[in-house]
Amino acid sequence: MNAQQPRAVRPAGLWPGAPGFHREVLRNPWYRLLGELQNSFNELTVEFWRRRGGQTLHLPITTGAVSSPIGLGSDSVPVRVDLGGAPTFLADSMQFTLELGCRMSRRACYYIMPSFRGEPSDETHLGQFFHSEAEIFGDLADVMRYVEDYLSYLAEQLLARHHSAVVNAAGDISHILALIGGDSFHSITFDEATELLDEGDIVDHGSWRTITRAGEQRLMQRVGSPLWLTHWDHLAVPFYQAFSLTGRSLNADLLLGPGEIVGCGERHIKAQDVRRALALHKVDPVPYEWYVDMREVDELQTSGFGLGVERFFMWMLRHDDIRDMQLVPREMGKQITP
């Protein structure tokens, strides 16, 4: 079915935690669909990695070594908490522990778990969201292929399981069918993107550049989507991404629907390269001494990715506000029940 259909199911838009929100969750079929998609997403992720020999890990949500610390290239603000009198952080990612898991198990490792960011929510960003993350053996090209296979598999299987409900919520499923049908994933370097975009789409910070959300949308319009945006300035990304031969970063963001839904990258192999990156990004090396030492013990080439689950659902349901992708809303700086 390619034609646009009326949207029979829509969210309430009652975030964050408006009085009676729990009643809306019980009444509105949007939230029932969301719960079903979440369940299927988890089941399908387990099956995807089972077929590829991957291993899941149960990891804590607190860490003393956030993957986006205060420093150049960090893409989020750490959430500091007090844990029995000890200052620590709610994890923005446990990617570093996935790297440890790869060395321990000699297998790809993955999880689906909450991610905490210290910024207010808006139309495309949640301060608390779910992250499907994995670390594999291989380089940047290898992990990009994993992501493409994973997204195509999720789209096909989720549509097969929930076809009628997805049509009722999205109104049009041509974008899903296109991805399932093998539409090519486009790819462009950050340097190439700057030649295609308008003034204001790229923000020049002096030693590094970033792209605006409007720039992401314009780039997809001009090049196509899904679109890989690769090889960013190294100071524009976190320190753990490996250096390319030209000094750029061996990383890639996948743009689809609301914008960036996947971030991935190749990791440093050698301890000396991690030390160099920490110094370049002006990050305190003390919490990451174990991360450096891990490479002294076992040098491996791994790469990893993180998929924002709610952003993926935004794309699938053709929705324009990620805050409607929460069964139980959360907002930075607010006490919300349930």
Give the predicted meaning of each segment.
Residues 50-55, 156, 160-164, 202-203, ...:
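Intrinsically disordered or highly flexible coil/loop and linker segments, enriched in small
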Residues 42, 46, 50, 148-155, ...:
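Generic solvent-exposed, charged/amphipathic alpha-helical segments
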Residues 28-32, 99, 110, 160-163, ...:
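Short, structured coil/loop segments at alpha-helix boundaries
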Residues 160-189, 196:
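Long, charge-rich alpha-helical interaction segments
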Residues 140-161:
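Internal alpha/beta scaffold segment
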Residues 73-145, 182-338:
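A translation/RNA-centric and nucleic-acid-associated enzymatic feature enriched
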